[in-house]
Amino acid sequence: MLLVIDAGNTNIVFAVHDEKGWRGTWRIATNHQRTSDEYAVWLLTLLTHARLTPADVHAAVIGTVVPAALYHLRRLCRDWFEVEPLVARASLDWGFDIQVDHPEEVGADRLLNAMAAHQTYGGPLVVIDFGTATTFDVVDKRGAYCGGVIAPGINLSLEALHQAAARLPRIGIGRPQSVIGKGTVAAMQSGIYWGYIGMIEGMTARIESEFGAKLKVVATGGLAPLFSEGTQVISRIDPDLTLEGLRLLALRNPTPFLNRDRARMVDGD
């Protein structure tokens, strides 16, 4: 069984996968102060609830955009699961070209999304990830990563409005019925929702124009379903895209086992 860890700026997602598919997925808020032992107490409780044990895990892979979390996540894998985790980075075997000026600067999550989207849906395509940042990543027909766009995330934009403007409240995200708001909250919701819909549509059109081809548009991230309701541009929603990318990367880059008595990998892990 493969332990998959996707560490983002807001949340860390843990998942396990075997020949039958995804056996469990769990999410915890990102906290730079949390230790490997604290992760272990939390995760082992959830594994027990799923009728799994650390001995069921034979490999691990970590994707992170939070360097401060990596040390403790590695220790978690080594100390509690006795496996040496693969850490996603540009220098690994991805199975495709990374056609940007500085590949090492590209966030692992963006490459993982590109890998999984092309494997699942074929190219050419663009992946829109509604995360802490809103990213657009372009993949050509052969699967090569062509670069993309990074914009402020939706929650980040909302928080910036609240922090920078004394009279603007902190609000939740929802789809307003009309563009023209009749109150402050409605106006803010419209600005965020329809403003981002406009960016999605406008940016996709500009990317397609520059790329010279019609692209499939795959969306991921927690807010993907909400924003897909407001546009016809998004053709697929895949909430597990980054996890699937980590699984595929682990298949291409097997790692040594710390405990040779458990040195086996279930077919399909």
Curated annotation (Swiss-Prot):
Ligand binding (K(+)): D129
Keywords, alphabetical: ATP-binding, Coenzyme A biosynthesis, Cytoplasm, Kinase, Metal-binding, Nucleotide-binding, Potassium, Transferase
UniProt: substrate binding residues: G107, A108, D109, R110, T184
Entry GO CC: cytoplasm
UniProt: ATP binding residues: D6, A7, G8, N9, T10, N11, I12, V13, T132
GO biological process, alphabetically ordered: coenzyme A biosynthetic process
HAMAP family reported for this sequence: Pantothen_kinase_3 (MF_01274)
The family this protein is said to belong to: Belongs to the type III pantothenate kinase family.
Protein name: Type III pantothenate kinase
Organism in which the protein naturally occurs: Granulibacter bethesdensis (strain ATCC BAA-1260 / CGDNIH1)
